[in-house]
């Protein structure tokens, strides 16, 4: 299991990432911005997600500026940060990568918004695609954590619909990534995570029929 998945958002970042100056600064800035936010899956500190994305990119051999963008990839969507803040602190390349994987909230409708995001990422280059893949791996893992609550919790129909929409987006994202980054270990890892999720869906469907 990745080191990142054990830190609970409270311990120091791994030594391997501390040696990357831009990443180190980005992780600390992200922790400040995401303070008090929690993950939907399990109520853990939200910072676990960008930390995991950064670590996945590090393991895949991404350069410092891409890993830093991984740490910051949700700050435009989920905090008060604006692109100018990122350009000032981390440079235009990091800011552009974060923007490439940030949704346009002006687009109404889940499917339309996610479709626009995939097109945006596809046009943003290989580094943005790597970042997008790492994000989807982490999100797929979170969706797996949610499965128990979806199966047993209140509001089951709404939760099931949301899960189906998210899984469809992840599958379409995988298809894009397989086309653009066919040899990336991140893409292979995403495929494995989605296979695991699909098996869980099949098991729940069989249980419901019985």
Question: Where do the language-model regions lie?
Answer:
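Active-site helical microenvironments for divalent-metal-assisted chemistry
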Residues: 1-210
